[in-house]
Amino acid sequence: DLYISIVSFKSFKRGGGIELEILQQPGMIYSHATELLNQLERDDVWSQTCEIEDKTEFIQRADYFVKGILLENIILSETYKCYQTIDKKRFYVSQLSVGVQEGLSNSEADLIIVDREKKESYLFEIKHSDKVVDRQTRHLQNEDFINYVSENFAPVKKCCVIYNGQPTKIDSIDYLNAEKFLMTVH
């Protein structure tokens, strides 16, 4: 399949989920993005009129951003497919993004897994990085966000960062290696 549809709710209580369409061809997407960035680098008009001081750094950051989105999509879609085969009524797997409408500062989880049977939820940030950085956990340490998830989905049992580094634990946050995580959902 070219893409997978995943329903995303802001709350189980209120319903009204939206469909997330996750493209299933990360290699194709990355190839297109890389070609567009290469064309941008070679574009004389862009080079002469763009007010970005360090264009090489801009291109590198754009590439890094694309890789981050692709990693999020891969982990979300593979985790979703895994839990759908286990028990699609028991497990809810999606993304979560809330904000002012929910009475919160903008907060998100790149991956939320809710076990409806055990009445517990797990929140994940997904980062295309091999470094542990405090900023990676800002949503996972936001007490208002954790309370919101606990009230609107199920009590939060664990918060984790999935990244490209070695597994470790800092305070209450587990850092999981992305490759190892993906191997567990296959």
Describe the residue ranges of each PLM region.
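Accessory nucleic acid-recognition modules appended to NTPase machines
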Residues: 1-109, 113
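Conserved catalytic cores of phosphodiester-cleaving nucleases, focusing on short active-site segments
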Residues: 75, 79, 109-133
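Arginine/glycine-rich "motif VI" loop of SF2 helicases in the C-terminal RecA-like domain
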Residues: 84-85, 143-155
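Active-site-adjacent loop/helix micro-motif of nuclease/hydrolase catalytic cores
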Residues: 103-106, 123, 130-143
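A structural signal for short secondary-structure junctions
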Residues: 103-107, 115-119, 151-155
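Structural beta-sheet core signal
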Residues: 123, 160-161
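Domain-level recognition of nuclease-like catalytic cores that cleave nucleotide substrates
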Residues: 161-186
